[in-house]
Design a protein with these regions (language model features):
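RNA substrate-binding interface of SAM-dependent RNA methyltransferases
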Residues: 71-163
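N-terminal positively charged helical leader segments and presequences
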Residues: 1-70
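Structured adenosyl-cofactor binding patch, chiefly the S-adenosyl-L-methionine
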Residues: 201-241
Length: 241
């Protein structure tokens, strides 16, 4: 029995042709032919069982046979906002794993001590799509490009909001304990993760003034991408249906 082939098509229900990159993979790598079955995902929670109707040099046409809406396996919306790492492969690693675990938004912060002040999201988007297909998750996280810390915390966000930091002079609560106390309450969750040098103390205070709760991620001192993944996994575990 052939393994199911999955393709990302944002407007799968209304389109009739795979996007160019997906078509090239379907035709050149998987060598799909007319009447072959494939599965599409729209990034908004649905799979589609489809049949290839035309397999040309650069075009792969299809016909939808069945729409299969999926129920999200976690409550609320989970957003992890982090300062991108100096080496982009570490940020890409986090984006891949967070997508596999299941989050709703990945945002990137330009902070005072950020090691990377510029970042491109085209490659990151491709990594996210690949992780969606690999993990069979039909939800594509919103990818929010690099935003100044001030602008991000100044924007109203619903639900529970946290900022992770390492300052002894600012009291913090444990992220896992706090989220566990709110388990199964269908709360949106936003967690801010700083750069390797941490947020500045003024940034932490600014976030607190905007309603963010200062939190600890445990006793270990974690790298940025590890801290971000820890936050994503913790939010997933306590919000799991």
């Amino acid at each position: 029995m052939k393994e199911a082939r999955y393709f990302y098509v944002p407007d799968a229900a209304n389109a009739t042709e795979l996007p160019v990159e997906e078509a090239m993979h379907a035709l050149r790598v998987l060598r799909l032919k007319s009447d072959d079955e494939m599965f599409l995902m729209d990034g908004e929670g649905s799979f589609y069982r489809a049949m290839v109707t035309l397999a040309a040099t650069k075009h792969c046409m299809y016909e939808i046979k069945e729409k299969m809406p999926q129920e999200k396996t976690w409550n609320g919306n989970i957003c992890i906002a982090m300062a991108p790492t100096k080496m982009m492969d570490r940020t890409e690693w986090f984006a891949e794993k967070a997508t596999e675990i299941g989050v709703d938004e990945l945002a990137f912060l330009n902070c005072k001590f950020s090691e990377r002040k510029v970042m491109r999201t085209v490659r990151l988007d491709k990594i996210i799509v690949s992780a969606m297909k690999q993990s069979r998750k039909p939800w594509k996280p919103i990818l929010t490009p690099l935003t100044s810390f001030k602008d991000f915390v100044g924007k109203e966000r619903k639900g529970l909001k946290f900022i992770a930091h390492c300052y002894n002079e600012i009291d913090s609560v444990d992220l896992f304990d706090t989220l566990s106390a709110n388990k199964n309450k269908a709360k949106d969750i936003t967690v801010l993760i700083g750069p390797e040098g941490d947020f500045s103390i003024d940034e932490v205070k600014m976030a607190i003034d905007k309603g963010y709760v200062p939190v600890s991620l445990g006793k270990s001192r974690l790298r940025t991408e590890t801290a971000a993944l820890y936050a994503a996994m913790t939010a997933q575990l306590v919000n799991r249906k």
